[in-house]
């Protein structure tokens, strides 16, 4: 008896490591329904063994879901506020009390309109004492572009690259504007954390256990809260202290962390920021710098950079291969050739001026 399970399916004993719990469920037809949201929460609960708690057993290191925005659900919310818009983005905010005017000024300066604020319904009694003691105010801010022709029926359009250099993808222009708005809010305020700010996706997360998420956020139990996919994450905090902000998913990724070369990567990034150029962002590029700010986890930093690459026009697989290049197998001499397709891309990226 060696204590190991036999190889079966995708299971390999040599890949056993401590790790956060990450999962995803999606409807391959692209149809949004509430069943997908429920299955996402079921996956999350089955990843409890991948999470952790501190001294308070009811306060988890973090749990959350990343989903497609349920436009029908939020249109009901807007109708109740006498605000109407066929297309809009939603910013999910932690904190920001007393900074509403600054936030609204940022939105207006980017040519967008504030449709209204919403206090997200929450149940503090469903979470632990420690999490409740540091719980931020949780709100949603609804944002519309003043150019309605550019964003008609966003929720019905097929997801595509964010690049619209050809001028045929105005949806991407609005999505990129929301990205710029988020970055400017982060710089203009001290106590506001933006979980997500998008016309496509939304994040519900917190300093929670997987079993608490649905109870804490009643929105997730509403039959009209639908999505074609759900990305879930149960956090096991190792190299950063657990906080509401550092719970996953982030705006674009849910990640295991433990990036050993993070300091070197961030130093190299900071050294090259001054030479960055982008035909997609143009003069707006300076609004989103620095790309990564201090005090984040390694996964949060990766999310910042991945988000920028996709917003600049690269597709998600391309951006991820740039950031986490595949490790090629050694050749017959036991060395890795820099002429291989993967390492060739990597060396050209890291050594190009």
Question: Would you name each region that the model predicts?
Answer:
Residues 1-353:
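Conserved short alpha-helical segments that host acidic/polar catalytic motifs at enzyme active sites
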């Amino acid at each position: 008896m060696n204590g190991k399970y036999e190889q079966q399916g995708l299971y390999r004993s040599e890949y056993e490591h401590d790790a956060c719990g990450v999962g995803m469920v999606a409807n391959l037809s692209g149809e949004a329904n509430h069943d997908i949201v429920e299955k996402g929460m079921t996956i999350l609960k089955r990843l409890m063994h991948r999470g952790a708690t501190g001294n308070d057993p009811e306060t988890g290191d973090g749990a959350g879901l990343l989903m497609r925005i349920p436009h029908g659900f939020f249109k009901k919310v807007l109708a109740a506020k006498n605000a109407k818009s066929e297309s809009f983005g939603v910013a999910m905010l932690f904190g920001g009390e007393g900074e509403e005017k600054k936030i609204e000024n940022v939105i207006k300066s980017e040519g967008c309109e504030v449709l209204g604020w919403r206090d997200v319904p929450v149940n503090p009694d469903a979470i632990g004492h420690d999490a409740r003691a540091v719980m931020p105010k949780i709100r949603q801010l609804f944002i519309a572009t003043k150019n309605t022709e550019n964003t008609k029926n966003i929720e019905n359009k097929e997801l595509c690259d964010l690049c619209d250099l050809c001028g045929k993808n105005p949806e991407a222009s609005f999505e990129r504007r929301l990205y710029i708005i988020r970055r400017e809010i982060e710089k203009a305020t001290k106590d506001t954390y933006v979980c997500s700010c998008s016309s496509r996706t939304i994040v519900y997360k917190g300093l929670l256990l997987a079993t608490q998420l649905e109870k804490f956020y009643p929105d997730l139990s509403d039959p009209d809260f639908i999505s074609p996919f759900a990305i879930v994450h149960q956090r096991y905090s190792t190299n950063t202290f657990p906080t509401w902000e550092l719970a996953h998913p982030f705006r674009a990724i849910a990640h295991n962390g433990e990036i050993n070369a993070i300091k070197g990567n961030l130093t190299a990034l900071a050294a090259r920021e001054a030479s960055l150029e982008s035909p997609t962002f143009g003069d707006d590029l300076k609004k989103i710098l620095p790309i990564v700010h201090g005090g984040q986890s390694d996964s949060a930093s990766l999310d910042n950079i991945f988000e920028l690459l996709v917003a600049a026009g690269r597709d998600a697989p391309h951006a991820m291969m740039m950031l986490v290049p595949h490790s090629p197998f050694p050749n017959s001499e036991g060395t890795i050739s820099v002429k291989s397709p993967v390492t060739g891309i990597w060396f050209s990226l890291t050594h190009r001026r």
